Amino acid sequence: MLHFNNLKKLIPHHVFLTKKIGKSDFFLVGGCVREILLGTTKNPLDIDFTMAGNPLEIYENIDKDGISHFITEKYGTITLIPKDKDNELKYELTPLRAETGYQDCRHPEEIFWSDDLLLDVQRRDFTINAIYYTQQKLKTPVYEQKKIINEEMLLKILNKEGFIYLQNNETLIIQSQKLLSQLIPNAKLDTDFLYYLLDIQPYAYIFWAGEKKGKKQIQLQILIDPALGIQDLVLKKLRTVGNPDTRFQEDSLRLLRGLRFVNVLNQKLLTRTKKKKSDPTDKVRLFDFEPETWKSIKSNHNLLKTIAKERIKEELTKAFSQGNPFGLVGLLDEAEMLVILFPALALTKHIDQPIRYHPFDIYSHIILTLYHLQAINTNYLVRFAMLYHDVGKVGQYAEYGKNLSKEEIRILLAGPLNHRFSSAVLAEEDFRKLWFSHKEIEEIQRYIREHHTPWEILLWNPQNRAKRLRKLLSDAGFERVNNLLDINIADRMGMYNPLQNASDLSDSRYLKKLLLEIEQEEGQFRSKDLAVKGRDIMEYFNLKPGKIIGELLEVALDRVLGDIKKRNKADQIFANLANHLKNLEGKNKEGL
């Protein structure tokens, strides 16, 4: 059942906005209402609302004390952010409007401000985002309750009567456009008609209510739902408002938003169920696409090419950080969008790998590793790195097909066609096209280039593993190294090859445990933490400033990382560097 009882969590927002705007003739709409009803949040932080009126006039009359505020004049969007120290709330008002002429598949050519809420509904993307909320203090009839309403009964009454009053939740739902035209003329509640709706005794009461017991004062929660979004929330269907082709051709970003909504909402529902620790055999109903909506998404997939890349990036980032990336990639593939967004990944399909390492093609291995990674790591950049960590194998394996000798293979693996390097190059190309920042791309590339490093550490004997891990920690920091170890675990789990015993991850888990111990006992030890500085080395060895000083500090650091407590002493460092310089001098003489 939907969480109608949680609607009261929206009352403080309604009260706050009433004070700021100076009137209560507005409606919360969109994600805040959807998430409250689904139970995926009790405290939404992004509150979208709408009302009738000219945006400039509304903006002028807002009480701006204690809030940051700005208006986007072209589309009339007004943003209000409370200035409280720990505030994360944002309110965004877009006045009721109608739109025409979406010639660029994104922005309307003309906007008409309106006082018709039913007209505003028609410009919304999906039915589950077109549920409007308001509230009203009034006296309502109280009936003796016979039984609790269930989902089947709720939908039956709504479909027949067009409205229902849920006494337990003090919630009134109205879907009938005929009733709504009388309830909200000019986008303002007609309280007389509201009383009329509550006072009559339709099937909405007869099914589960007995005799009338009088009236009581309540804070009535009102849901205005002409697009029948309640039905789709109950049945977990993503459906466009009106004709799907029209909706997607008006605004092509809706194609990707639709995939993201289904993906992220399902992840939230699964997470909520796990937190409740209910019976693991209980089934959770998850969102799927209404057939015509999905058919339209697939047939209009090429419209994705018309969308501004920064908007695509925003949708992908939300899905990869909040949702199920593995599932999203599957949807993108089925909707023929994968090759548009991630071309290097699409090319890995049907490229077989050496059976002794991988029983699957490159693509299958990659998405399996992504599946395992998302269970242990939520960092969206790490997840994107996992998505591209092996895409360079396409070029590497193409060279293998030329019957190279062992020496030629050795040279290939030492060069740019080694998939650790070529994958990073391909990631840079594809993520730059998606408008990822230079910093984000560098981070993704770093994980790709280093994704074999944990394997290499495990090849060392146990005595040297701690030193190698300290070196990696010194260079990259705890969070990056921990992420690399997660990538390593997921990479191994994605092999599914009994010959490699990939299910035994005890050594990789040992590295994670060792990393935590080093971090807690020693922290990230870097050259600046050495007992000697560059100037000490210059003075001790009578050297001038130059490249050699940095090299000697690196030599010292490499030595000290073997046992920080014992070796980070000036006399030991100088003795080690003296031997190093002596060896250098000998090599130079041999070169002469």
Where are these regions (language model features)?
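Catalytic cores of the polymerase beta-like nucleotidyltransferase superfamily
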Residues: 1-592
